[in-house]
Amino acid sequence: MLCFLRGMAFVPFLLVTWSSAAFIISYVVAVLSGHVNPFLPYISDTGTTPPESGIFGFMINFSAFLGAATMYTRYKIVEKQNETCYFSTPVFNLVSLALGLVGCIGMGIVANFQELAVPVVHDGGALLAFVCGVVYTLLQSIISYKSCPQWNSLTTCHVRMAISAVSCAAVVPMIACASLISITKLEWNPKEKDYIYHVVSAICEWTVAFGFIFYFLTFIQDFQSVTLRISTEINDDF
């Protein structure tokens, strides 16, 4: 286990396990409390009503932090690899990081502004998180191909691009169907006119969310051979 998490591998590993736990625990508590229907609630539905709202908010906030830490570490890894063997313009890597961090900010917004309390802000945060997150995975997949075979195996590149493609394919109907729903609510009746839009949107939302989780899982091997150091200097003038 310790060998598996050598180097900086513990960062994406913690992100994956913590985020998975956040989704699952919030869902279980919300269902057992009778606050949501067990069949395909939105992820945000499982974090709207106390006590699950507190669990969801706390855990997703920390997931956003871990996501930012993982993305920044990945940025530094690619930067160092590119210095050793040039394969991509540094701007491409920087744009990817910027979009990823914006997505993490969106996660923070989702965690702190519940969908029934401030739906406009919540939905805006969700849009940032999902769209920027999907574009981030796509850009990182392209970078992986550019660095192949020096820094990534072709299999890893294919897996990352496959996850990115599925996420891209899911995020479009997720947004489209969600925009067609006329009311924000936690419980749905199959006979309601917007029910099909809710189901399609919820399926796509869960697909994209766990797509992110599986994508970051592919970073673990890359992070195993990496060490980050913080350098401290004291200025004698002060």
UniProtKB/Swiss-Prot annotation:
GO terms for biological process: apoptotic process; autophagy; cellular response to oxygen-glucose deprivation; regulation of autophagy. Pfam families: Frag1. InterPro entries: DRAM/TMEM150_Autophagy_Mod (IPR050911), Frag1/DRAM/Sfk1 (IPR019402). The chain crosses the membrane at residues 9-29, 53-73, 91-111, 116-136, 161-181, 200-220. GO terms for cellular component: lysosomal membrane. It is a multi-pass membrane protein. Keywords: Apoptosis, Autophagy, Lysosome, Membrane, Transmembrane, Transmembrane helix. It is found in: Lysosome membrane. The keyword Transmembrane applies. The keyword Membrane applies. Lysosomal modulator of autophagy that plays a central role in p53/TP53-mediated apoptosis. Not involved in p73/TP73-mediated autophagy. Belongs to the DRAM/TMEM150 family. This is DNA damage-regulated autophagy modulator protein 1. It comes from Mus musculus.
